[in-house]
Design a protein with these regions (language model features):
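Helix-to-loop junctions at the C-terminal end of transmembrane segments
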Residues: 62-75, 277-289
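Cytoplasmic membrane-interface "Motif A"-like loop-to-helix N-cap segments
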Residues: 71-83, 287-298
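Cytoplasmic helix-loop-helix junction between adjacent transmembrane helices
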Residues: 106-142
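Extracytoplasmic gate region of multi-pass secondary transporters
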Residues: 26, 30-37, 220-281
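Extracytoplasmic
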Residues: 10-45, 62-66, 151-152, 243-250
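C-terminal ends and interior cores of transmembrane alpha-helices
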Residues: 84-97, 300-313
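Hydrophobic core of transmembrane alpha-helices in multi-pass small-molecule transporters
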Residues: 20, 89, 100-116, 236, ...
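Helix-loop-helix hairpin linking two adjacent transmembrane segments in secondary transporters
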Residues: 144-193
């Protein structure tokens, strides 16, 4: 692990920052401002959830094509474009007054933040650090956990200080000011790494024509494979339930009479579970492979759902339900 960090710290830090600053497009970030957004746009909980779901679904459909850009565009240029796209989404949401601008703003946040920035980070780790893909993906993915630990408290403080609209604008400015120079520095000389990857890829494909586990699959091949459809329910149920819970967290806090500021401060406990899960799963993936872990992915989340109705205090809700939920959460695994 230490050798990996010493030799590949630039690429690992790039992946970490991409996941960390994907926060404005993540549900935990947007939902903390949902009360103010609903009030400004005169939407109920259900109506805002419908808008959010529609924008997220549109983003998922577009990802079928936009996700392929990672294979076609220079990583440095693409990453900078994603940062600006996310910043534009923050700007549009900050001035939204109706359904159209709200949908557009949320769509851009979900597409560039939750979708492409996170996907770019994970793809870079797996693609260029193949022999340490588990540990590298875990280290880069820790950006999400750290973001979850500190962003809610910062966002709540920013909300109380400058209001929700200015909070989005401040987020956009900081996003560009920090990420653009960081990407230019951390991916300096990346072209040589990518050329080496292409050379190795062509050699592997030529040697593994009869081995479906090693060669690169095309999209039509994946769609025709029956095991893909058996895997989809387990894979999609986790983000579906997790996003639904996080999206309505403000409503849950209000319903149970808890303090939003205390709730936000307890995200750090949640993040610690995420970090631990990432590190353990990273080692397991590198040692045993990802396939043996698949049958166990949804079990902790199922236990957490059983315990949710009996969590009476904010502390035990975080300790039991959210910790178990996050073990199954796809963002906590390589």
């Amino acid at each position: 692990m230490l050798h990996l960090i010493r030799t590949e710290w630039r690429l690992l830090l790039f992946g970490f920052l991409m996941t960390f600053f994907s926060a404005p497009g993540q549900t935990f970030f947007i939902s903390l401002l949902s009360g103010e957004i609903r009030q400004a746009t005169h939407l109920s909980d259900g109506e805002f959830a419908a808008v959010y779901s529609f924008a997220t679904l549109c983003s998922a459909v577009v990802m079928i094509w936009s996700g392929a850009l990672i294979d076609k565009i220079n990583l440095q240029k693409l990453s900078i474009a994603l940062v600006f796209g996310l910043a534009v989404g923050c700007g549009i949401l900050s001035i939204s007054t109706g359904i159209v601008s709200l949908v557009l703003g949320v769509f851009l946040l979900r597409q560039f933040g939750q979708g492409l920035m996170y996907l770019t980070s994970a793809t870079a780790m797996v693609r260029y650090l193949e022999h340490n893909r588990g540990k590298s993906t875990a280290l880069a993915g820790m950006g999400y956990a750290v973001s979850e630990a500190i962003m809610p408290s910062i966002l709540v403080a920013l909300l109380l200080w400058v209001g929700w609209r200015n909070s989005w604008q401040v987020t956009a400015v900081f996003l560009i000011a920090i990420m653009v120079p960081a990407i230019l520095y951390l991916l300096r000389g990346h072209r040589q790494r990518h050329d080496l990857y292409l050379t190795q890829l062509s050699e592997v494909d030529s040697q593994s024509l009869g081995n479906p586990l090693k060669r690169q699959w095309t999209r039509p091949e994946v769609i025709r494979d029956k095991f893909f459809y058996l895997f989809i329910p387990a894979l999609t149920s986790q983000p579906l339930m997790f996003t639904g819970f996080i999206f309505h967290q403000v409503h849950l806090v209000e319903t149970k009479g808890w303090s939003l500021s205390v709730w936000a401060s307890l995200f750090i406990m949640y993040a610690l579970v995420s970090v631990g899960t990432k590190m353990v799963s990273g080692f397991l993936v590198d040692r045993y492979g990802a396939i043996p872990m698949v049958p166990w992915l949804s079990l902790p989340m199922g236990v957490g759902l059983v315990l949710l109705p009996v969590t009476l205090t904010i502390f035990w809700e975080v300790v039991f339900f959210r910790s178990l939920f996050h073990i199954s959460d796809p963002t906590s695994r390589p």
